[in-house]
């Protein structure tokens, strides 16, 4: 009788172990799927935002977004871009003024956003524009994933080719042959989040 009891206990323990392993496998599979779905959702729901509140996002959030930018793909992993993360109001307004001068008006080209992430890249690397553009994409997607709005603002190239733009780089201690790729503005969205416009019909040409 004692042997039968021992056998039953051992069998129950084996069944419990198998059940736990199966449950863990199911849990891992379920936990992986939402992550994939969330990534796709972020890709499909990100929008360019042109209306912001004055509220400054937490520094740790900005740092995480910058980190995402550093993981963008670059040609032969040369990592030619750099990011200037501007949260200082005086510098932000200075860059806004320079950008507006290039644009030819007095409006704020940063749409009131409190944060500007300037992406530059080493022009001696032949993939510098592509590298910097991928960084910009990562920054905007990461901002959306963190609940912030973003927008790619052009004219970084012209700003940092100007004498004052070069002076800013010198003041920041940045040396090298860097060319501006883009300004990623960040902040909390003011007003309604914009809806996506319809996609054009001839986006993809299949070759099967």
What does each model-identified segment do?
Residues 1-8:
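Bacterial N-terminal signal peptides that target proteins for export
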Residues 5, 18-208:
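Acidic, surface-exposed loops and disordered segments
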Residues 8-16:
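Bacterial N-terminal signal peptides
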